[in-house]
A protein has these predicted regions:
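Charged catalytic and DNA/RNA-contacting regions of genome-maintenance
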Residues: 1-277, 281-283
Length: 286
């Protein structure tokens, strides 16, 4: 069984692995040490045939949401490894697989969400001095996209981030050259940041992904390559983590960044506009 665990954990190194054993989700080794500290769980051990017992802790599967919510709120990813066959009918070791990876920006459960505001995941990518930017709330299906260009791109970008206040940010391309951006995110946002490999933004691949998701709406962004790239990279990330279709996300709301009045962080804070309206675009309207 532990060989099965090691194989699955190897494929999910950046997540806390909730490994289903009977009526519990168990965590082992470093995951167990971390979870026991963050969730105030008793750290025990399991004999795994090695010189020392494996550190271990667990939570009941029927009440796991509260524990997962606490970890995700702290910025951790949680990979759910479920039994994929009936143990009573299994021949030998019960088959297990990852059924979902829950991240700060991919929470779906109402019990884990604040109903007063959206829970956005953001993806941004820059190429040839143009920034593609999109925000998605997978719990509602809302998806907004825009492109930013010009000498004031950095300020426009940070204003957009302030307005949407995403919980998770995916970054790629020349965005990494914006040296002040990490400081801004750390100081002004409560968001985890993940760097995506360049191939995730491959225009050909992203075009196919966007077309497959929005067959009737691809034409609205087809001439905006960086937007196609961020949409494709985001959708691929969501498919990889959710392990299911994204039927709820069925419309692209493309807007021009100069279509609405843009307010900086301090102005929005002073006007009490931060985190109070269900629609970030409403907060930008003049």
């Amino acid at each position: 069984m532990m060989q099965q665990y090691f194989k699955i954990k190897e494929e999910n190194k950046d997540s806390i692995l909730f490994f289903r054993l009977g009526d519990f989700y168990e965590m082992f080794y470093d995951d167990a040490k971390l979870a026991s500290k963050e969730l105030e769980l008793t750290l025990t051990g399991r004999d795994c045939g090695q010189a020392e017992r494996a550190p271990m802790c667990g939570v009941p599967f029927h009440s796991c949401e509260g524990y997962i919510a606490r970890l995700v709120a702290k910025g951790y990813k949680v990979a759910i490894c479920e039994q994929t066959e009936d143990p009573a009918k299994a021949k030998g070791l019960v088959k297990r697989d990852i059924i979902r990876v829950i991240t700060p920006g991919t929470v779906m459960e109402s019990s884990m969400l604040d109903e007063s505001k959206n829970n956005y995941i953001c993806c941004m990518y820059s190429k040839n001095k143009t920034i593609g930017l999109c925000f998605c709330d997978i719990s509602t299906g809302e998806l907004y996209a825009t492109e930013i260009r010009g000498n004031d791109s950095y300020n426009v970008l940070t204003n957009q981030l302030t307005s949407y206040n995403p919980r998770e940010i995916l970054i790629g391309g020349d965005i990494v050259k914006l040296k002040e951006l990490p400081k801004f995110i750390k100081a002004k946002l409560s968001a985890g940041v993940e760097m995506l490999e360049d191939e995730k933004f491959d225009e050909s691949v992203c075009t196919d992904v966007v077309k497959s998701q929005f067959a009737d709406e691809y034409s609205t962004v087809s001439d905006k390559s960086v937007v196609v790239c961020v949409l494709g990279a985001l959708l691929s990330y969501l498919r990889d983590t959710q392990k299911t279709g994204l039927e709820r996300i069925n419309h692209i709301e493309f807007y021009k960044e100069n279509q609405y009045m843009s307010l900086d962080y301090n102005t929005q804070r002073n006007l009490c506009l931060l985190y109070t309206s269900p629609s970030p675009r409403d907060r930008q309207k003049s």
